[in-house]
Amino acid sequence: MDVKPDSKRPSVAYFSMEYGLSHVLKIYSGGLGVLAGDYLKEASDSNADLCAIGFLYRYGYFTQTLSMDGQQIANYEAQNFGQLPIDRVLDEKGEQMVVDVPYLDYYVHAYVWRVNVGRISLYLLDTDNEMNSEFDRSITHQLYGGDWENRLKQEILLGIGGILTLKKLGIKKDIYHCNEGHAALINVQRICDYVAEGLTYDQAIELVRASSLYTVHTPVPAGHDYFDEGLFGKYMGGYPSRMGISWDDLMDLGRNNPGDKGERFCMSVFACNTSQEVNGVSWLHGKVSQEMFASIWKGYFPEESHVGYVTNGVHFPTWSATEWKHLYAAHFDENFLYDQSNPKIWEAIYNVSDEEIWKTRMVMKLSLIHISEPTRRSYI
């Protein structure tokens, strides 16, 4: 853990609405969060220079139970932050750090917490404090909870608040990675910062594009976040002047068809327009995403766009049974966990006998039976 990050690779700031690290920390709901959590764990194992931004939800996503007639019941259970594996981030006065995020004509105040994911620092924002109104305290109550206005307030906190958090921490990175369009507004704040330093808008957006990466998970347009111009303008109306552009210019960055006043602002379109690299999460999904976003780049074929793919992976130590870990430790290179993309290391599997693999498989099968049989009986 004391080894310094690999300076030969670009440093990364990662933004996501959810992280699946452990069932103890209820800040995830499904695959998007599990991928993000594994991403941080793998970054730690491979000694990448990375930090991450997310939310510390008071209730997280709901816990599912079933009624006697088989209907789903959603239970929201409050987390006791004092019993979680998290640390308060302190300011220069020794008090818990607070980030002030502008909303309309007032500020929302977010506490900053840290989760140590191996070598990686995950900073979590929390608005459930007495400095905020009842409505703003609820911004970080539930993952994907509330109406569209609350969703926009969450995405402002993640994007704009996330960048302000890094600034307050004194952290600068080479690449800014949006895990889904929820974090797209990081590039609004980054453009504002560059313009405040004396750059023109055109210079600022090129710098932002060159250092931004957007990962899209959703395969259909209906799954992306769209905001009516009235609602979006209610909270974002003050930003165009700081960016050096007009309101229509900002809206057009989030439209498939710039100039169409009836089209809503799409976070995913904005992310595509302000990111040099966009990737789907499999080869097929990359192709689907090229078609889905094709209308953004008029006059180009879908395959000519900068939308590619990186196939989803998992964090090996998290998802491997202890028995398999012992087998790999006995036969694989000691650097296996730190260089899993090296095919030569994987060739060691051919040195493992069929008998040993079969024995391990049967041990796991018996373990599954021991788990599943009592569960089966309880439902009969």
Where are these regions (language model features)?
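Extended, Lys/Arg-enriched charged tracts that mediate electrostatic binding to polyanionic substrates
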Residues: D69-V115, G280-V288
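Single conserved hydrophobic/aromatic residue that forms the stacking wall/gate
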Residues: I369-I380
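Extended, charge-enriched "interface" segments that sit outside catalytic cores
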Residues: M1-K4, W324-L368
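A short beta-strand/loop micro-motif in the catalytic core of glycosyltransferases
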Residues: H177, Q276-S282
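A conserved hydrophobic secondary-structure block that centers on an alpha-helix together
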Residues: S22-I53, N132, Y144-C178
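Membrane-proximal helix-turn-helix segments that form the acceptor-binding/catalytic region
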Residues: Q203-Y214, V220, W247-E277, S305, ...
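Segments forming glycine/polar-rich beta-alpha architectures that bind adenosine-containing cofactors
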Residues: F15, G20, V24-K41, D45, ...
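Conserved oxyanion/phosphate-binding beta-strand-loop segments in alpha/beta enzyme cores
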Residues: M1-E18, N116-D136
